[in-house]
A protein has these predicted regions:
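C-terminal/domain-terminus segments
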Residues: 87-111, 115
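Flexible, glycine/small-residue-enriched loop-and-beta-strand segment within the central core
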Residues: 1-86, 121-128
Length: 128
């Protein structure tokens, strides 16, 4: 499912990307690099609604909006979530049901809520 919710929304999907039912909610840019794999029910969301007490009645309540960028050859396992402002480096893996709240360096495996690095991927493994 692709949802664009703002005039600044833009979704860019690279070459040879495998999409297995992700949800992309964009009020800013979402960019997915070449050769990525997105598992089932992966969610990308470039904005968060305010936690302000009158958010349901105040249309001007602040909303955090930031782009998301996924590098090349990244695998996002099923049911993970990528939150506003995150950049995931090339050749990384995001584990099942991980919640990615901050940037992920290239060549690592992250898992958990919030996602954290659990292992580095060797140069040899990245390109085999």
């Amino acid at each position: 499912m692709l949802i664009t919710a703002d005039k600044e929304a833009k979704i860019i999907i690279g070459n040879n990307v495998r999409l297995n039912g992700p949800t992309l909610i964009a009020s800013r840019q979402i960019e997915i690099g070449d050769l990525c794999i997105l598992g089932s029910a992966v969610v990308f969301d470039t904005d968060f609604h305010s936690v302000h007490k009158d958010r349901s009645t105040n249309r001007d309540a602040p909303v955090r909006k930031s782009p998301i960028k996924i590098g090349k050859n990244v695998w996002l396992a099923g049911q993970c979530a990528v939150l506003p402002g995150v950049h995931i480096g090339d050749d990384s893996v995001v584990g099942f049901r991980a919640v990615v709240t901050k940037d992920v360096p290239a060549g690592v495996i992250v898992a958990g809520n919030p996602a954290r690095v659990v292992r580095e991927i060797s140069e040899e493994s990245r390109h085999s």
